[in-house]
Structure formats: structure tokens, C-alpha cells
Amino acid sequence: MTNIRKTHPLMKILNDAFIDLPTPSNISSWWNFGSLLGLCLIMQILTGLFLAMHYTPDTSTAFSSVAHICRDVNYGWFIRYLHANGASMFFICLYAHIGRGLYYGSYMFQETWNIGVLLLLTVMATAFVGYVLPWGQMSFWGATVITNLLSAIPYIGTTLVEWIWGGFSVDKATLTRFFAFHFILPFIITALAAVHLLFLHETGSNNPTGIPSNMDMIPFHPYYTIKDILGALLLILTLLALTLFTPDLLGDPDNYTPANPLSTPAHIKPEWYFLFAYAILRSIPNKLGGVLALLLSILVLIFIPMLQTSKQRSMMFRPFSQLLFWTLIADLLTLTWIGGQPVEHPYIIVGQLASILYFLLILVLMPTAGLIENKLLKW
């Protein structure tokens, strides 16, 4: 008798995706992050669902409803901080996953890569609208500053901003619609993630060498399920340590002050995972220029497959490209640091130089290094 998992219409889909999936035998722990992102998404949806049961999306009660969750709801504080720090873990996994894709040339699976960029943008949008919901000072001013950027669009900008606000300032209507967006977007992310997997399973996984591995495949289960479980345990352990020992480590103290339109915080800054993009935005003195640079800092990922000049897919055997890749990582860390600093000397110039280097590395230096390495292959 044939196994039910191979014949049942639903089980067959799961079997082909998680059990009998042929997987390269040499993929490293850098390939763990896909499943960890799935785990993060499930955790965020579940904790978010329980928070939504007690939260009220109204300017007069939003802040106190979050306080009520933390004080009066059974384990409400735990659910709230799991959700807040879960977002940080989500972005750590997301950036590691993208970094892996860049290093090993996974971006050559173009459909999978483009869906991935779309996923990144959707997750960033979800995190942004979610940060507005507690209705603290940083929530309010973050929403005001970031939505205001759209006013830089010529002709329709101001109308667009007022349309998003649902009025002439960030107010009740804005909070209500942001809650609606924050509730629906994770389900859109889930659907996109399914399409992401669908496209990935059309080609099969890449591997560290970047060489086709069709002649050496092993089943996903038990080899990689056990490896994914180890990764999941490490992720959960880190998240629990963060949540139970230092829940506010990555948050902003200003968000414990209720939103006040009449008092601007000294330093308006987003959560840590947006600081690199915020630094690029601030490094250009022109509003429209800054907005375009901000958009391009993420959308540049779409152009990476077109900028592949090397004959080798992976950076595993390309020392010049490796050096530039790690320079890019250092540059992104520098931008993250700058994004959290006040706008004054020497941070302004450091931010501008780091922003120039970011685009220079991706658009010019890395493709050039690929060409040089091609020449070296002939020696």
C-alpha cells in the first residue's frame, strides 16, 4: 500500500515541500533562516492575535489598553514583549537570509529573489504600522515623520499624505487604519511566503559552492528537519532571554510617554532594524532626494541579479568579492549606528560617506570585482 502522505492531495503538497524534498547535501546553517522566518511569522501572528483581543485602536484608549495588557491580562506582559522582540528576531533572520542570498548567489533564482524583495518591503510596512499602535511619543512622531515623506512627491504629494492620514494630521483615523493594515498584512506575507517557496521548489535550493547539486541530493526529512529544529530552539532561547531579562533593550524609552502632538521628542528615530535606511534618508539634504535614496536602498536588491558579472555564482572561491561583501556588512552596521545618532558633526559626514559607499559597493565595486576575478581565472 502506498503511503498516505504520497497520495492524499493535501499531504502530498506538504510531503513534497518538507519531507521528500530533494535537498543539496552540503547546505550550511546559513540555510536555516528560511524556516526560522516561517517560525517567526507564526509566532508573530499568534502573539499578535492575542494582543488584538485586548487592544483598542482609538487615540484616547490605545496607550492605556497596552498598559492594561501588561498589567491586568494573564501573561499579557509576556505576550506583548514576545511580539515586540519577536519583530527584532524576525528582522535579524531576514537580514541574515538576504545576506546569505547575496553571498552565495541565490539571487540568480530571479522569481524567488523578486518575491523575497516584495516580502521584505511588506514586512517593513507591517513593522512600521505596528510600531504606531501603542500610541506613545515615538509611535506618533515616527508616523508623522515617515508618512510626511510622501509629501515630497511632486504635485500629488500633499493630497496623498492627507489621504493616508484620513485628515490634516496623524489622528484617530490614522491609528484605526494602521491597525487594519497591521492585522491584514501578515496574512498577505503568509501568502507571499507560500509563493516564495513554490518558486524555490521549482529550481531546488542553491548550495555554498554555487554549482548545480542534482547529482548529490538527500531527502529534507530527517536530515534538515532535525537541523531546523536545532535552529528553532536557538531562536526561541534567544527570544526568551531577550523577553524575560531585557524586554526593553531594543525599544525606545520615549514610547512610554503617551503621544502628545504639542511636544516633539528630542531625537525622532525608528526601531533599530530601520536605522540603516533612516541614515541614508537623512544623509541627503533634499527631501525628494532623500526619499528616493531611501526607496533605492531597498529596491537596489532587485537589480543585483542583473549586476552579476562573475562566471562563478557563489562568493565561496572569490576573495575580492568576499572582501567587498564584508565591507558592505560593516558599512550597513555603520549606517545603523549613524541612524541612531543626532544630526550633528561628525555624524552627518560619516553618514553621507557610508551612504555613498553603500551604493558604490553594490552598483560599481562588486560587479567590477566579478570582472577582475573572471580575468584571474585565465591565469
UniProtKB/Swiss-Prot annotation:
Cofactor note: Binds 2 heme b groups non-covalently.
Sequence similarity: Belongs to the cytochrome b family.
Positions contributing to heme b b566 binding: H97, H196
Gene Ontology BP annotations: mitochondrial electron transport, ubiquinol to cytochrome c
Note: Heme 1 (or BL or b562) is low-potential and absorbs at about 562 nm, and heme 2 (or BH or b566) is high-potential and absorbs at about 566 nm.
Binding site for a ubiquinone: H201
Needed co-factor(s): heme b
Entry keyword set: Electron transport, Heme, Iron, Membrane, Metal-binding, Mitochondrion, Mitochondrion inner membrane, Respiratory chain, Transmembrane, Transmembrane helix, Transport, Ubiquinone
Biological role: Component of the ubiquinol-cytochrome c reductase complex (complex III or cytochrome b-c1 complex) that is part of the mitochondrial respiratory chain. The b-c1 complex mediates electron transfer from ubiquinol to cytochrome c. Contributes to the generation of a proton gradient across the mitochondrial membrane that is then used for ATP synthesis.
An MF annotation (GO) of this entry: ubiquinol-cytochrome-c reductase activity
Residue ranges crossing the lipid bilayer per the database entry: 33-53, 77-98, 113-133, 178-198, 226-246, 288-308, 320-340, 347-367
One GO CC annotation: respiratory chain complex III
Entry superkingdom: Eukaryota
UniProt subunit comment: The cytochrome bc1 complex contains 11 subunits: 3 respiratory subunits (MT-CYB, CYC1 and UQCRFS1), 2 core proteins (UQCRC1 and UQCRC2) and 6 low-molecular weight proteins (UQCRH/QCR6, UQCRB/QCR7, UQCRQ/QCR8, UQCR10/QCR9, UQCR11/QCR10 and a cleavage product of UQCRFS1). This cytochrome bc1 complex then forms a dimer.
Binding site residues for heme b b562: H83, H182
Protein name: Cytochrome b
Pfam families in UniProt: Cytochrom_B_C, Cytochrome_B
UniProt membrane topology term: Multi-pass membrane protein
Subcellular location(s) of the protein: Mitochondrion inner membrane
